[in-house]
């Protein structure tokens, strides 16, 4: 599927691109049209400061979250453990957990995680179709699995989630709805919305549409904002769950472009966003904007295209563009601290992959 292929697998992308170099995206059809943003009122270039670690652990550091003087980094392709906890801001290794393997206590994959507190770290294993909750102790240098929530088979292969006080929010990957509310037993209890495409597409290609619209999501319980950014194209959705409003925005690159072949979606536009963080006032997102035909050209020249995004886009909670940061390093995951004006980011292109930016 598109999303599994795109995240962290340049070899898979290359094979797909070479195989689809002659196909084009879906044809525009009359339908709903959403607002566009084209520029940001403020732009600024910022430079990375490399964080020096006392241990070499990472193969593909994809996500990072800092909370309660602890930083947790998720490594998408680690041979041993998917998660690594450090003290913060000193970055001393505490413990690695989420052992990779096929055993009952092990994980087949790690798509993302949510760090709520030291005893509430939720991790999503799409291949096992389960969410596990972990607790870590800096004092004991330990991590223990507290519970496992097995997801209903009707959710197919969930690739992202947000945990709220009452349920999980999980995107729908069949294309019938936009996302599900899922109870803490793993059962879907309510479907919400539809994919906000501007194209008039046949119902039989909805699974391909859902693949193309694979989104990264975040939820802020303080303001009730759930936001999604697409991995392909340049589309943003903002659900205000307290006011029951839904905002859709397209950037200059528009919605995800794809070609449907036998019900499967093949990307033909750009790599879009790679992470999203919602604070009390703003929405931060990492943006790539690299065209697939440029990636294909790089592979055909025998070169490896850059992996990651060099932009952080900032929107207010209503979707108005506020700030565009241009980075001197390509990044994937971000953690935002507005009080200290600090961005912690992961970079898969560097041997020193944890970086800090000041905004």
Model features per residue range: what roles?
Residues 51-81, 284-295:
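Beta-strand-rich domains and repeat architectures in extracellular enzymes and scaffolds
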Residues 62-65, 111-116, 158-164, 208-222, ...:
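Structural signature of eukaryotic scaffold interfaces centered on beta-propeller domains
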Residues 87, 181-182, 300-318:
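Beta-propeller blade signature
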Residues 128, 136-167, 171:
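Asp-box/WD-like beta-propeller blade repeats and closely related beta-sheet repeat scaffolds
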Residues 285-307, 354-357:
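Short, conserved, GDST-rich strand-edge loop motifs in beta-rich repeat architectures
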């Amino acid at each position: 599927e598109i999303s599994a292929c795109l995240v962290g697998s340049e070899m898979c992308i290359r094979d797909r691109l070479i195989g689809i170099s002659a196909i084009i995206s879906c044809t525009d059809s009359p339908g709903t049209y959403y607002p566009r943003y084209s520029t940001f009122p403020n732009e600024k270039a910022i430079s990375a400061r490399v964080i020096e670690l006392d241990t070499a652990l990472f193969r593909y550091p994809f996500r990072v979250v800092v909370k309660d003087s602890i930083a947790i980094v998720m490594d998408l392709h680690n041979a041993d453990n998917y998660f690594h906890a450090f003290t913060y801001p000193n970055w001393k290794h505490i413990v690695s957990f989420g052992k990779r393997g096929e055993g009952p206590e092990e994980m087949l994959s790690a798509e993302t995680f949510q760090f709520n507190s030291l005893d509430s770290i939720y991790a999503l294993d799409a291949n096992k179709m389960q969410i596990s909750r972990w607790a870590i102790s800096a004092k004991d240098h330990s991590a223990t699995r507290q519970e496992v929530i097995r997801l209903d088979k009707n959710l197919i292969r969930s690739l992202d989630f947000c945990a709220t006080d009452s349920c999980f929010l999980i995107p729908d990957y069949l294309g019938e709805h936009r996302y599900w509310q899922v109870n803490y037993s793993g059962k879907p209890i309510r479907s919400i919305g539809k994919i906000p495409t501007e194209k008039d597409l046949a119902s039989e290609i909805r699974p391909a549409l859902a693949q193309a619209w694979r989104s990264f999501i975040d939820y802020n319980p303080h303001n009730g904002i759930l936001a999604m950014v697409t991995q392909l194209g340049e589309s943003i959705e903002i659900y205000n769950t307290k006011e029951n409003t839904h905002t859709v925005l397209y950037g200059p690159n528009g919605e995800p472009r794809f070609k449907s072949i036998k019900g499967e979606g093949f990307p033909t536009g750009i790599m879009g966003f790679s992470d999203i963080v919602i604070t009390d006032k703003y929405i931060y997102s990492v943006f790539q904007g690299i065209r697939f035909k440029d990636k294909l050209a790089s592979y055909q020249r025998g070169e490896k295209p850059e992996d990651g995004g060099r932009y952080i886009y900032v929107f207010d909670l209503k979707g108005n563009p506020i700030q565009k940061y241009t980075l001197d390093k390509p990044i994937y995951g971000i953690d935002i601290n507005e009080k200290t004006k600090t961005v912690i980011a992961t970079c898969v292109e560097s041997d020193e992959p944890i970086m800090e930016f000041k905004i």
